[in-house]
A protein has these predicted regions:
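Glycine- and acidic-residue-biased ligand/ion/polar-headgroup-sensing regions
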Residues: 71-74, 80-101
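Short beta-strand His + acidic residue motifs that chelate non-heme Fe in jelly-roll/DSBH
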Residues: 76-78, 96-97, 118, 123-129
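His-enriched metal-coordination microenvironments in redox/metal-binding proteins
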Residues: 46, 58-63, 77-88
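Short acidic-glycine-tyrosine-enriched beta hairpin
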Residues: 59, 94, 100-121
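Positively charged n-region of N-terminal signal peptides that target proteins for export
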Residues: 1-4
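Bacterial N-terminal signal peptides
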Residues: 7-18
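Double-stranded beta-helix
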Residues: 29-31, 105, 125-156
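A short, N-terminal "cap"/entry segment at the start of jelly-roll beta-barrel domains
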Residues: 19-64, 149-156
Length: 156
């Protein structure tokens, strides 16, 4: 039950952004976006992280794409998502590990151009030592479930 509450809270945090005006919706026409056109918003479910929704909304069962901008020295505890996650590193270095326990010694450094693909439900964690931007592709609705609900950064 705690996992469901966490997922609902995260969807609500993403949903407020996904339903806002911006690039997040289009009518099936060709879409081209430059980095200068992205609108960055605070991400309540990950305090300190910014999100730019490119395609969405994140609350519906549609293709989604968004960028996450992590500050330096940030970490996200072990968690999973209900859909497949494709993440491409745009800038900086995202250190990613797999499993239920956060362990910096068991991560791989993903530098610009690197890609990670995780099946639904894969437990993983990340950390940064510098500002890092990653672009996520998936199918909504998007949510995050923490392995340990007490680790949810939005609750701290």
């Amino acid at each position: 039950m705690k996992h469901i509450a966490t997922a609902v809270a995260v969807i609500a945090g993403f949903g407020a952004l996904a339903l806002s005006e911006g690039l997040g919706q289009h009518s099936g026409t060709h879409l081209m976006i430059s980095p200068a056109e992205l609108t960055w918003n605070d991400l309540p479910s990950l305090p300190g992280v910014k999100i730019a929704v490119i395609e969405g909304p994140l609350t519906q069962a549609v293709p989604i794409m968004f960028r996450l901008k992590f500050p330096a020295n940030y970490q996200v505890p072990p968690h999973s998502h209900p859909g497949i996650e494709h993440i491409t590193i745009i800038s900086g270095t995202l250190n990613m590990g797999m499993g239920d326990v956060f362990d910096r010694t068991k991560t791989r450094a993903l530098t610009p151009g690197s890609v990670a693909i995780m099946p639904p439900g894969t437990h993983h964690f990340v950390w940064t030592s510098e500002e890092t931007i990653g672009q996520v592709h998936s199918t909504g609705p998007w949510s995050v479930t923490y392995v340990n609900p007490a680790d949810d950064p939005s609750k701290k």
